[in-house]
Amino acid sequence: MKAEATVIPSRCARGLPSWQVLSPVQPWQTSAPQNTTQPKLLAPHQHEKSQKKSSLLKELGAFHITIALLHLVFGGYLASIVKNLHLVVLKSWYPFWGAASFLISGILAITMKTFSKTYLKMLCLMTNLISLFCVLSGLFVISKDLFLESPFESPIWRMYPNSTVHIQRLELALLCFTVLELFLPVPTAVTAWRGDCPSAKNDDACLVPNTPLHLKGLPVEPPPSYQSVIQGDAQHKQHQRLREVKQVAPDTWIVTDGAAIWTQTAN
């Protein structure tokens, strides 16, 4: 009787690995990017640095305003008590236009902390430059009153001062405030110029460059070659267990399962 053989593959041969079932060059492997970029975000260290500069600019502006108010107070008091003395500092009205210059510089410096615009930055630089010239002019006129063309008869260190000595001491205090103002315009201008957030271009945000973000769970290696796929398929078939059934009689079959051979009957 002619034997009829049937080959039944085992369960382990029902499916191949996903990289063997698909073609060697997969679309998702070639088209999907291995890395992507994050959106532009505010860098923490740059944000902290920007906040420190803004705080410093605010403090410098507060010093400007304080010295301006002191100039107004001392200048107004000097103008009210001086009668017969010829003071260049009052004839030139330095305590008032100097105070106005310092006040505008301080207000612009504080405003830049809230509204960091390009035109405000330029205005702040210009007003601080003008304040520097005002300070130099004030030093000249006060020094002329106290040292060069002094209208005071008594020295400032007199033990029993009169009204003239009081005026001289007030002008000396005004000189001290002017010297303090001398150290403010340049740091204020530099801090305003080196600000990191020129909001006219990036809407008040300091942005960092795009950085690569590696996606987890996606393959980043190149696709396997055709030879490696064929070799892997051959090795898989060698380990695959095949079942061969031969019918030797109407009710008898010989089953070969690779490792063993047995006979199976219909009963």
Swiss-Prot record:
Main subcellular localisation: membrane
Compartments where found: Membrane
Gene Ontology biological-process annotations: cell surface receptor signaling pathway
Membrane topology recorded in Swiss-Prot or TrEMBL: Multi-pass membrane protein
Transmembrane segments: 62-82, 92-112, 122-142, 172-192
Keyword entries, A-Z: Membrane, Receptor, Transmembrane, Transmembrane helix
Extracellular compartment segments: 83-91, 143-171
Domain of life: Eukaryota
Cross-referenced Pfam families: CD20
Ranges in the topological domain labelled Cytoplasmic: 1-61, 113-121, 193-267
A GO CC term assigned to this protein in UniProt: plasma membrane
Entry keyword Flavoprotein: no
Coiled coil keyword on record: no
InterPro entries associated with the record: CD20-like, MS4A
PANTHER family in UniProt: MEMBRANE-SPANNING 4-DOMAINS SUBFAMILY A MEMBER 10, MEMBRANE-SPANNING 4-DOMAINS SUBFAMILY A MS4A -RELATED
Role, per record: May be involved in signal transduction as a component of a multimeric receptor complex.
Family label: Belongs to the MS4A family.
Protein name from the UniProt record: Membrane-spanning 4-domains subfamily A member 10
Species of provenance: Homo sapiens
